[in-house]
């Protein structure tokens, strides 16, 4: 692409023939880590006529058009869209001598955003936010980033998860209540033992529950002690602050076996039933067992 093209790219190569002092100053001023992920500029001489020139490669943080970039480099640069990898361009621009080098190239098989993504994970940024911020890096290294979070960042639960149970007929607004419950992000637990996609969300929803988890597992989920839950390929800490369970049946009818369901009831913090004004706490006399103690 000629330098007068109206295209916008992040990766460019440039040549400045017979560079002046002002050209050197412009290149040095522009090639910094605020503008470039990686930049390398070499001093060369033409093979035929021996013309001195600067040969450079830029991997920019933001797309730039040729005209604007030419101005930033002093106004005399010939520009073209870069081809090949960062490493290929690094080798080409440093074949005679290297005048300037800033940042690090994107190595083959490695995302240049990986260190930043790892730093955000270590700082406690939720893994879903990391995925949104660095989608390509997450696609390539998501499992490793999640493992990093599990090993370094995760904390075990040492609080009582608040358990809210809603009992009502179909179509009475239980799922709507759970959907509108204030939370930055919720995790909807699917039927079965797997917790795929759970990444420490504060609110977990078990919608239309009727006993599809082992009873002892449910008791542990509703408790206050450290708990690791299983996803396909590993385990992670269960750290929900709130658990919302909706059902058409009362908890005492969730399991057919002879369990002591009072152990479940006492872990329930709020037991809500449908009233003319919406869902509200059930009167104590309506409950077969005492809750929240």
Swiss-Prot record:
Keywords recorded for this protein, A-Z: ATP-binding, Covalent protein-DNA linkage, DNA replication, DNA-binding, Endonuclease, Helicase, Host nucleus, Hydrolase, Metal-binding, Multifunctional enzyme, Nuclease, Nucleotide-binding, Nucleotidyltransferase, Transferase
Keyword Membrane attached: no
A Pfam family of this chain: Viral_Rep
Major location category of this protein: host cell
EC number: 2.7.7.-, 3.1.21.-, 3.6.1.-
Residues of the CRESS-DNA virus Rep endonuclease domain: 6-105
Segments carrying motif Nuclear localization signal: 3-13, 62-83
UniProt KW Hydrolase keyword: yes
Chain ranges for the short sequence motif RCR-2 as given in the UniProt record: 53-55
Catalytic activity of the protein: ATP + H2O = ADP + phosphate + H(+)
Residue numbers binding a divalent metal cation: 44, 53, 96
GO cellular component terms, A-Z: host cell nucleus
RCR-1, short sequence motif: residues: 13-16
Motif interval(s): RCR-3: 92-95
Active-site residues (renumbered): 92
Subcellular location(s) of the protein: Host nucleus
Binding partners and assembly: Interacts with the capsid protein; this interaction relocates Rep into the nucleus.
Name of this chain's protein: Replication-associated protein
Organism: Goose circovirus (GoCV)
